[in-house]
UniProtKB/Swiss-Prot annotation:
Protein name per Swiss-Prot or TrEMBL: Probable GTP-binding protein EngB
Binding site for GTP: 30-37, 57-61, 75-78, 142-145, 174-176
Ranges where the EngB-type G domain occurs: 22-195
Native organism: Clostridium acetobutylicum (strain ATCC 824 / DSM 792 / JCM 1419 / IAM 19013 / LMG 5710 / NBRC 13948 / NRRL B-527 / VKM B-1787 / 2291 / W)
Swiss-Prot/TrEMBL keywords: Cell cycle, Cell division, GTP-binding, Magnesium, Metal-binding, Nucleotide-binding, Septation
UniProt binding sites for Mg(2+): S37, T59
Alphabetical list of PROSITE patterns matching this protein: G_ENGB
CDD domains: YihA_EngB
Presence of keyword Magnesium: yes
GO terms assigned for molecular function: GTP binding; metal ion binding
GO cellular component annotations of the record: cytosol
Record's function text: Necessary for normal cell division and for the maintenance of normal septation.
Amino acid sequence: MIIKQAEFIISAAWKKQFPIDGKDEIAFVGRSNVGKSSLINAITNRRKLVKVSGTPGKTRLVNFFMINNDFYFVDLPGYGYAKVSKKELEKWSQTIEGYLVGREQLKKVILLVDSRHKPTKDDITMYNWIKYYDYKCIVIATKSDKIKRSEKVKNEKLIKETLKFNDSDEFYFFSSATKQGRDELINNICSGINYSENSL
């Protein structure tokens, strides 16, 4: 799988604004500042496809990006940032869950967690939502360049135990800084997605 083209399509505030062309979708979700924008930029090899915000919790819309004119990457709002009102937190929750409900085009959800830390309560809730709505899930532990190789086994065990990880799902470490394992990650993220010869 080769990503030759990545194009921003729309920032959607409402479900009626979501694309209706029926193309497959892969969604990316994680708490604020987990490195979601950096990861999407890294795997598409576009430095500025997704704007990396210095302000946690700034992304509040559902952003759609067309990949190779075949399918979408969907960037969901970051969750879990403390310095917002309860009303705003509820709005983000509604936005994320509103996207997940009955989205037939959605083929898998990529949940990003910080490789350095135990998953938060919000991470656990998000993972449970993904499983409740019966989507295929890939958990990516970001910022892996920040931990020692010897810590990876311990941290992977902690993350999986905290999430009550389902063995049918997949787990990867990734660093947007080094991009090590990028090609393998792309192939696994995009497996099972409908795409044309343009993506081969």
